Amino acid sequence: MDRPNILLIMTDEHAPMYSSTYGHPLLQTPYMDQLAQEGATFDNAYCNSPLCLPSRMSFMTGRYINQIGAYDNASPLPSDTVTWAHMLRAVGYDVTLSGKQHFCGPDQLHGFNTQLARDLHAELWTKNGMLRGTADWSKGTPAAAKPWGGVAEAGPGTTTEIEVDDLVEERSIEYLRDPTCKEKPWVLNASFIAPHFPLIVPERYFDLYPLDQIDMPEIPEGHLENQHPVHQRMRSMFGAADFPEEQ
């Protein structure tokens, strides 16, 4: 049996309920719908960590986060840790990454042959292997220099993240159209930042959803007062504790 080519498309912080594929009445995700109709969907699939990097490292290795020491977004994966990229290369695949996989530290491939488009998170690391802007919680709750933008900055526009995602798409298509792709089986991991914050999108997409048609989340009485202390400290760190109620 011929070995199949594999195109792995990833989006970031994309909850399934925010897609027409999983029944959202307003959002339009036609290409996801097409993939689902022509393939299979899964209703009981879970990531192994609520944090970005640990979840991705578990996905890359097939191991629990406690087995690989990935507990936060500043945990480099040891270069000698085997990933599925290593395993597929070992059986003759060309294994290519285009975009984000949230590797931190000097090794930005972890088994991939090459990376076609940049990962912004790789640029957060200093030359001595430290994450820029890492908070020292041992000295108490760090204070934000300014309130985190979050929803307050949401709207139409462009960002570096959008430009990088456009490059991920462009380089991925170039790779797939390259005749040399037919020389050996390939795996292409096209990994996008969106819909991860900043919550800014090109105007043509923003205009698809009139604000008066978007339901606001239901917030129970006493929600802020009854938050877990960890959540309260996070609100303080992001400078969100003093937001007025309408925000």
Language-model segment annotations:
Residues 1-247:
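Formylglycine-dependent sulfatase
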